[in-house]
Amino acid sequence: MAVLAPLLAVLYAAPGLLRWVSQPYYLISALLSASFLLVRKVPPACSVLPTQREDGNPCDFDWREVEILMFLSAIVMMKNRRSITVEQHIGNIFMFSKVANTILFFRLDLRMGLLYITLCIVFLMTCKPPLYLGPEHIKYFSDKTLEEEMQSDGRVSWIVEFFANWSSECQSFAPIYAELSLKYNCAGLKFGKVDIGRYPEVSCRYSISPSPLSKQLPTLILFQGGREVFRRPQVDKKGRAVSWSFTQENVIREFNLNELYLKAKKIRKHQEESIHENEWNDGKKDQ
C-alpha cells in the first residue's frame, strides 16, 4: 500500500506532467535546476571536479553541498505552504534550485558560476512561462472599452481582473479565474480582464501599482452599477498590498459569488417573464 499510493498519484498527475515537459520553458528550467546534480554525479564530468570529501571521491556531494541542498529543501517547503496551484509549487522548486545551483557552482569554480549565471540570464530573456490557453468565459478590455462596458448596463455586475503577463502571480491565478468564469458567468454577472502592462493609464485610473514590490497584481475589482464596490487585495497607507491568497475559495467567499450569481439569475428570470408578459399583452391587443 505504501508503494501503491505514490504510484497512483504519479499516474493521476501524468497528463499534467507530460504537458509541462512538452513546454520548452519547463523542460529547460528543469535542466537548469538539476544542472549541478548532473555535473556532480554523472561521469566523466564529475571526475575532474574538486572536492572536500575525505575519501577524495569527486562524484559525490561533500558535507557543505549537502548542507546547502538541505537548506534549499527547507526553504522550498516553507514557500510551498502558501502556494495555490501546482505551477506555483513547481515554480518555487525551480527558482530556489537555481539559487542553490549558483552558490554551489561558485564554490566549485568562479568560471562555472559565471557560466551558470549567464545561462540563467539568457533563459530568462528568451523563454517565458506559457500563458493559460484553456476554456474561459472572460471579456478582455482596453483602456477605452472598460469604462464603456461598466457604464452600459447598471444591472450587470462585473468582476474585473487587472493583470500583467510578466507577473508570475497573474499567470498562476489565470486558470483559477477562468474556472470561476465558467462556473458563475451569466447575464447579470460577468467576468473581465484588462492588461495594465499594455494599458498603463488604467493602472493610474484605478490606483493599481504595476511595480512588483507593491504586490498589487493581480487585483480583482467588483463593479456594480458602473462603480467600484469591492477589491482585493486591499492597499495600506504605504501603497503596499495587504497579503491575500488568490484561491478559488477566497474569491468565492470574499466576493460573495454564490449570492451574486443567485441574484443575477433572479434578475434575468424576472426580465424574461416581463418580456413574455409584454409580448402576450401585445398579442391580445392585436386580436
UniProtKB/Swiss-Prot annotation:
Residues 134-287 are cytoplasmic. It holds the Pfam family Thioredoxin. Residues 14-112 are extracellular. Residues 137-209 form the Thioredoxin domain. Residues 1-13 form the signal peptide. One of its GO terms (molecular function) is disulfide oxidoreductase activity. It is found in: Endoplasmic reticulum membrane; Mitochondrion membrane. It is a single-pass type I membrane protein. Keywords: Disulfide bond, Endoplasmic reticulum, Membrane, Mitochondrion, Signal, Transmembrane, Transmembrane helix. The keyword Cytoplasm does not apply. One of its GO terms (biological process) is brain development. Its main location: endoplasmic reticulum. The thioredoxin domain lacks the 2 redox-active cysteines, suggesting that it lacks thioredoxin activity. The di-lysine motif confers endoplasmic reticulum localization for type I membrane proteins. Monomer. Homodimer; disulfide-linked. Occurs in both reduced and oxidized monomeric form. Oxidative conditions increase homodimerization. Endoplasmic reticulum and mitochondria-associated protein that probably functions as a regulator of cellular redox state and thereby regulates protein post-translational modification, protein folding and mitochondrial activity. This is Thioredoxin-related transmembrane protein 2. It comes from Xenopus laevis.
